[in-house]
Amino acid sequence: YTKKVTVPKKSKEFIDKNYSGTTANTTYWAPDLYYKEGDEYPYWFYLSTSCGLGGRNSVISLIKAKSPGLWDGEYADAGVVIASKENNNYNTNCIDANIFTDTDGKTYFIWGSFWKGIYMAELDTDTGLVKGIDYTSDATILSSGQKFGTRLFSTPSGVLGPEGPYTVYNKDTGYRYMFTSYGWLGTNYNLRVARTNKTFSEILSGSNPHK
């Protein structure tokens, strides 16, 4: 992105960074895209919003569109998916969404940044929202990121990472790889990877999901 935090609109040659404009203003960042085949609005964009760098007043929201260009065609605001507050005792931070569909067909919503680690919960692929959250209650939605989901891992101090999770499955190795960033936004910033040959449902049903 540019100096202003913006969401790249599209790029024919992403490796060469030939961006063709932006699709949102400075309030949205860390997007992830999920394609729901057969849906009226099949392109689901999960976007992060925070009240300042390093804060925990954060939300991940969902916008559904008919075109991958997002603002190029019709779109629908699906609202807040999950939210966190600055003064929460669990040091959670609801940004950096990642959507991953496992080999058993279950789809997961993965999030978390910088503070108390990376979290995971099952996604309802009919709505694009997270299973287990009462979306009929504004109060519940606004505190949904506090002590919700399963924490996969974090640093011992609870700060300086991990953040920015991104998960892929390699059918040749049979492993799921989760890439995350650690450290402060400086020379010690580094990228790490964790892997597992178990499905996430197997991990979440175990006694120690951190392994």
Model-derived features: where do they sit?
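Carbohydrate-active catalytic/glycan-binding domains of CAZyme proteins
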Residues: 1-211
